Amino acid sequence: MKQNLYISYNTQGMVLSSYPFGYDFWRIYNGYTKREAIARYKEELRQKLGVKRLPFSFREVKD
């Protein structure tokens, strides 16, 4: 079985985890559709990092 690792940002900085999104994402995701949640997460992350565009993209990985 292939293990996927994902980089997520949280209050401690960059974290490598086996979950597609970090804690921040699931906090925001609560009560939104997945697409809305990802859009909100990207926007929040963009502002947190202080950039115009994120230097990476989000995609779902299926085994």
Residue ranges of model-derived segments:
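Short N-terminal "domain-start" leader segments
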Residues: 1-16
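Short intrinsically disordered terminal tails
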Residues: 1-3, 59-63
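Intrinsically disordered, low-complexity serine/threonine-rich segments
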Residues: 11, 20-24, 59-61
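Short intrinsically disordered, low-complexity segments
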Residues: 15, 22, 41-43
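Short, flexible N-terminal segments of the mature chain
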Residues: 18-36
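A short, charged, amphipathic alpha-helix used as a generic interaction element across diverse proteins
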Residues: 30-53
